[in-house]
Amino acid sequence: MGVAAIAYSERQSLSELSQERKIQVRMEENRRNIRVRIIVEGKVQGVWFRESTRREASHLGVFGWVRNRPDGKVEVLVEGPEERVRRLVAWCHHGPPAARVHKVQESQEAWTGEFDSFDVAYAGGIW
């Protein structure tokens, strides 16, 4: 990498890097995109499960949302390359350190490509 490229790289904002990551994920060849809804049961609310899921999803480069449900469960809707989505599903089986996951249900849905980020959803909407 040349000096000019390094200098440009250092000047890039996180949002630009994030946008490049989004494009990279969407452009991956030979990857099948899937959509999975995940329901996580156990001690999963009040233990930073949503924020930890958002961080893990962003790290993996998958898109969708995570939210608490009124019944004490956490729901995740995720889209992206199959291998990366499967890695997030596997992560949900243990979650963050304070969580105690007892059961994970997953159901595959038709991929829509509607998301361009991964967000924490709250009662008032996505944040």
Identify what each model region corresponds to.
Residues G2-W127:
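Intrinsically disordered, low-complexity, mixed-charge
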